[in-house]
Amino acid sequence: MAAPSGGFWTAVVLAAAALKLAAAVSEPTTVPFDVRPGGVVHSFSQDVGPGNKFTCTFTYASQGGTNEQWQMSLGTSEDSQHFTCTIWRPQGKSYLYFTQFKAELRGAEIEYAMAYSKAAFERESDVPLKSEEFEVTKTAVSHRPGAFKAELSKLVIVAKAARSEL
């Protein structure tokens, strides 16, 4: 029997993280915003948690077409130790060509992140980017110059509250 694929393990990790958070997650906040083409760098940012403890900022540049309606959903665990940020186009696939993207967190360190070229819509499933197309650091998910193929429709980030130094 062949070993499970990388996609299988990604799904297992995401499911485990989601189950861990689902046990005690506050109602997420979802905010619509426009992704605007034109090649200019734009940013959209939202805060969540007690005292706006966490911030998720989506910075991008894209080309083609007209504005697209996207959404950013933010949620925290009841103990405010975990944070989720999901950025996506609810209609599924984006028709814009992204020249760059970066989702950056403040107040938390990333435990899991995935980028998708196509978001689930109706009977279609999410289509993840190839791992070489994006990179994940402790606080950001971003395109990998030269490898990113300009398709983005969704970002999912699960993070844990950053430890404060005593």
Swiss-Prot record:
Q: Which UniProt keywords apply?
A: Angiogenesis, Apoptosis, Endoplasmic reticulum, Golgi apparatus, Secreted, Signal
Compartmental location: Secreted; Endoplasmic reticulum-Golgi intermediate compartment; Endoplasmic reticulum; Golgi apparatus
The primary location reported for this protein is secreted
The record's account of tissue expression is:
Expressed in prostate, spleen and lung, and weakly expressed in the left ventricle (LF) and liver. Expressed predominantly in inflammatory cells, such as monocytes and macrophages, and weakly expressed in neutrophils, T-cells, B-cells, endothelial cells and cardiac myocytes, after myocardial infarction (MI) (at protein level).
Keyword Endoplasmic reticulum among UniProt keywords: yes
User: Null-mutant phenotype, please?
Assistant: Mice show normal postnatal body mass gain, develop normally and are fertile. Show larger infarct collagen-rich scars and more severe heart contractile dysfunction compared to wild-type mice after ischemia and reperfusion (IR) injury.
Q: Copy out the induction comment.
A: Up-regulated by ischemia/hypoxia and reperfusion (IR) injury in the left ventricle (at protein level). Up-regulated during adipocyte differentiation (at protein level).
Q: Does the keyword Glycoprotein apply?
A: no
Give the source lineage, highest ranks first. Answer: Eukaryota, Metazoa, Chordata, Craniata, Vertebrata
Family assignment from sequence similarity:
Belongs to the MYDGF family.
Encoding gene (name): Mydgf
An example GO biological process term is: positive regulation of protein phosphorylation
State the function annotated in the UniProt record. Bone marrow-derived monocyte and paracrine-acting protein that promotes cardiac myocyte survival and adaptive angiogenesis for cardiac protection and/or repair after myocardial infarction (MI). Stimulates endothelial cell proliferation through a MAPK1/3-, STAT3- and CCND1-mediated signaling pathway. Inhibits cardiac myocyte apoptosis in a PI3K/AKT-dependent signaling pathway.
Name of the molecule in the record = Myeloid-derived growth factor
Which superkingdom? Answer: Eukaryota
Where is the secretion signal located?
A: 1-24
Q: Which InterPro entries match?
A: MYDGF
Pfam families according to UniProt: UPF0556 (PF10572)
GO CC annotation terms, alphabetical: endoplasmic reticulum; endoplasmic reticulum-Golgi intermediate compartment; extracellular region; extracellular space; Golgi apparatus
PANTHER family per record:
MYELOID-DERIVED GROWTH FACTOR, MYELOID-DERIVED GROWTH FACTOR MYDGF
